[in-house]
């Protein structure tokens, strides 16, 4: 095999392996901690947690929203569980975010788009050399 082809193949495999992992802000669970400064890379099968919506019964019913601070296992996503506080039971809906750094109020999608553009440019420059002999 040509060395250029092997390089492209290895780069593609590395990009695919790392490209599936997302980053999330790790707030540490503390309201005073700065989420913008602590970034964690979520492992495969561990998407970013989303908002937990807790609907409390009453007149009128109340919905509490809680944002989880870090990556979670995929089986915890999109779940509805029953939680109890004293004599009151209520449903808790847990969803997960999809996308890089999306557990923030301002999601960042520039990095993945930039990586794709750079990869497309590199392939455009390198592929003609493979067929030129």
UniProtKB/Swiss-Prot annotation:
Instruction: Please list the disulfide bridges.
Output: 27-35, 42-71, 77-96
- What's the name of its gene? LY6G6D
- Cross-referenced InterPro entries: LY6_UPA_recep-like (IPR016054), LY6G6d/LY6G6f (IPR026524)
Is this entry keyworded Lipoprotein? yes
Q: Does the keyword RNA-binding apply?
A: no
Protein's recorded name: Lymphocyte antigen 6 complex locus protein G6d
The GO terms this record gives for MF are: acetylcholine receptor inhibitor activity; identical protein binding
Task: Tell me the organism's taxonomic lineage.
Answer: Eukaryota, Metazoa, Chordata, Craniata, Vertebrata
GO annotation terms (biological process)? acetylcholine receptor signaling pathway
Signal peptide range: 1-19
* Segments forming domain UPAR/Ly6: 22-116
- Which residues are annotated as pro-peptide in the record? 105-133
Give a Gene Ontology cellular component term annotated to this protein: filopodium
Question: Where in the cell?
Answer: Cell membrane; Cell projection, Filopodium
For this protein, what post-translational modification is recorded in UniProt? O-glycosylated.
Tell me how this protein sits in the membrane: Lipid-anchor; GPI-anchor
Q: Subunit structure, per the record?
A: Homodimer.
């Amino acid at each position: 095999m040509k060395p250029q082809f092997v390089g492209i193949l290895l780069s593609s495999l590395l990009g695919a392996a790392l490209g599936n992992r997302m980053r999330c802000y790790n707030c540490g669970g503390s309201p005073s901690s700065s989420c913008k400064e602590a970034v964690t890379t979520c492992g495969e099968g561990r998407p970013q947690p989303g908002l937990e919506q807790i609907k409390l019964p009453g007149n009128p019913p109340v919905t509490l929203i809680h944002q989880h601070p870090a990556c979670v296992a995929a089986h915890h996503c999109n779940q509805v569980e029953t939680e109890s506080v004293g004599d009151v039971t209520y449903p808790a809906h847990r969803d997960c975010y999809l996308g890089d750094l999306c557990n923030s109020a301002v999601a960042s999608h520039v990095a993945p788009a930039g990586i794709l553009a750079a990869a497309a440019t590199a392939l455009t420059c390198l592929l003609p050399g493979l067929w030129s002999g």
